[in-house]
Each structure stands twice: as structure tokens, then as C-alpha cells.
A protein has these predicted regions:
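Cysteine-nucleophile protease catalytic domains, especially the papain-like/related folds used
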Residues: 1-47, 54, 69
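Noncatalytic regulatory segments and standalone regulatory/sensor domains
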Residues: 22-29, 57-68, 72-82, 89, ...
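Conserved beta-strand termini and adjacent loop/short-helix elements that scaffold enzyme active sites
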Residues: 48-50, 111
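Alpha-helical and His/Cys-centered functional microenvironments
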Residues: 85, 96
């Protein structure tokens, strides 16, 4: 994941170099390990638990997300889907569901599966990991390149 984010900003690090910096083990790597490696190559990092609305509206992309509570992916795009015109005047007839609340596409780079596109519902099912005061949250690592990143 970190390699993908570094490439986004124009730097190419070997996988081996980043693995050694992140202290990867047989059981994988932690968000702290990724954060330490990122700071080692010149990123400023912040780990957060966020609601979907915070991720969608406030987070600069790309960022790294904890995925299915077992590995990490890069979120590189969140786009509102074009709305299909509704043929009903106000609300759909009883029995038909409106999908107006789920109208985003989330673009994810998964080191295991490649470039993927998820509907909001699919994405949230994989990303949510916690509920705080009735609000569902997921974990992300925000990365911002510093001047040091570009000088290394």
C-alpha cells in the first residue's frame, strides 16, 4: 500500500525496502508499522477512526484503509454516481426501495487484487470495523508528503 501511495507522488521504492522499514512479519504488518515506514521516507501520517461521512467529505486521497479487519488497501477515489432519473413523482411505491442514500463509487487499490471499484454499500461492508456512540467507523491512515519526501 505504501508503495502505491509513494508512486502517486512520483517516488518508486522497492517492495523489499518498504517491507524492512515497516517491520513486516509472517502475520502481516500493522497500521503502526506502515505509519513508521511512511514517516521514514518523508510522509507525515495520522491514523484515525472515521465515519463514512468524514471519509467521504474531509479526507485527502489517497489514504490507506484497514480492510475486512485483516489487511490494508489504498482508497484513491470517491465519486458520486450519476443519478438515474426517478420515474416516480416523490417516493417509490410501497415495496420498492430507493437507493438515493447509497450513490457513491469508491476506487480502491488492493495489493492482493489490483484496482477495484465498489458501491458505497459494498465498500462499507468491508471497511467498517467499529461502532462508537451509535456511529459506525472504519480505520484509515492519512499520508501527506513533506519536503523531505521529495528530497530523498
Amino acid at each position: 500500500c505504501l508503495r502505491m501511495v509513494a508512486m502517486h507522488y512520483g517516488k518508486n521504492y522497492s517492495l523489499q525496502s518498504l517491507r524492512s522499514r515497516s517491520f513486516i512479519t509472517r502475520s502481516g504488518v500493522s497500521m503502526l508499522g506502515i505509519s513508521n515506514a511512511a514517516e521514514d521516507i518523508g510522509f507525515r501520517t495520522l491514523g484515525y477512526r472515521l465515519s463514512w461521512e468524514q471519509l467521504r467529505d474531509e479526507v485527502p486521497l489517497p489514504c490507506i484503509a484497514h480492510w475486512n479487519q485483516r489487511h490494508f488497501v489504498v482508497i484513491y477515489g470517491i465519486k458520486k454516481q450519476r443519478r438515474i432519473p426517478c420515474i416516480f413523482n416523490r417516493t417509490p411505491p410501497e415495496g420498492l426501495k430507493s437507493n438515493r442514500s447509497r450513490n457513491y463509487l469508491i476506487y480502491v487499490a488492493d495489493p492482493a487484487s489490483g484496482l477495484l471499484k465498489y458501491t458505497e454499500k459494498e465498500f462499507l461492508r468491508c471497511w467498517y470495523s467499529n461502532q462508537k456512540e451509535g456511529i459506525k467507523e472504519g480505520a484509515v491512515l492519512l499520508l501527506e508528503p513533506t519536503q523531505e519526501f521529495f528530497l530523498l
